[in-house]
């Protein structure tokens, strides 16, 4: 049985990290101060005030709540408390569903370890990067922390030398666990957990962060968490989900030939209402995303003056995708044409419009996409553009407040 569940009061006054003096290593406190982290978010406060930093926990938290620091800080505290730490082997293993989320976690980790002497190396193992180069760096280096996507870690574990690097684990974190299962990584996760030292024997700390806890995750928890693990939620059970609050509409088109003009009209109308339009347009495939990116890039966006136009799709190289993430996060306006490679773990601020072309692969995907706008009490809107044969999605999901519009 898990320990008592704790629901976080998100309206409570923010607690400063300085309160952790004497509990958190001085080098971690210095790094927090150096990088401008002053107050804990609610989820960070609850995790960091568990009886011990080594306690297993299941945490329900949405993207943008500060959950990355909520698992990195106790994991690093755990690691730095080890006498004669072997820095040549992995002490902390973090698994994430996408390359972009893995990179974000690694970037935060580098900030938190910036005041450590000698330094702790954080390595990343993700698809889309040069396997030979990264594996060689991993084997020759001192990868005290490893952030990986499941597929690439399975690939690494086929090498005896790589498996040896994972024999002294102190902490294993599953971030966006439900997203990893949604992406079909359940078999990979089971293979990974079967190939690293078993929790029952090695005694490593387990942490699982997930917005939802479906039955598939419940089945996997005994491999990651102790029976008496803490359970924390930042999700108010009385809070209406974003999908119930964001205005939603569908624009049916007579044929697929009308999709592009309709999307252009939707964006033009939105731009007329809001010159600082920042929109994500989800496309059916990577090829569609690339095509619309080039079309809108050459026609000046939805309307002059030109909006910045971006693309994010699986055919892009990892450096190009990383550059897009950084640029779209930094801009206050623009259009991002994306395939489903834009996973839930990627947090883009101030999105005021989401456009979905075609039906999502599943109901949850629709919910996740709508949830990219209208965050933190800000105004947002979601639009679908559907061909006649796709209108079944509306009648099959009458619980969504989707208004049916005539074609523009």
Where are the predicted features?
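Conserved pre-motif I regulatory segment
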Residues: 9-60, 77
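Conserved nucleic-acid-binding Ia/Ib motif block in the N-terminal RecA-like helicase ATPase lobe
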Residues: 29, 37, 85-156, 168-171, ...
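Walker A/P-loop NTP-binding motif
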Residues: 45-57, 68-86, 108-113, 154, ...
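Conserved helicase ATPase core of P-loop NTP-dependent helicases/translocases
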Residues: 133-137, 289-300, 305-343
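Post-DEXD/H (motif II) to motif III coupling segment of the RecA-like Helicase ATP-binding lobe
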Residues: 162-239
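Conserved segment of the helicase C-terminal RecA-like domain
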Residues: 370-407
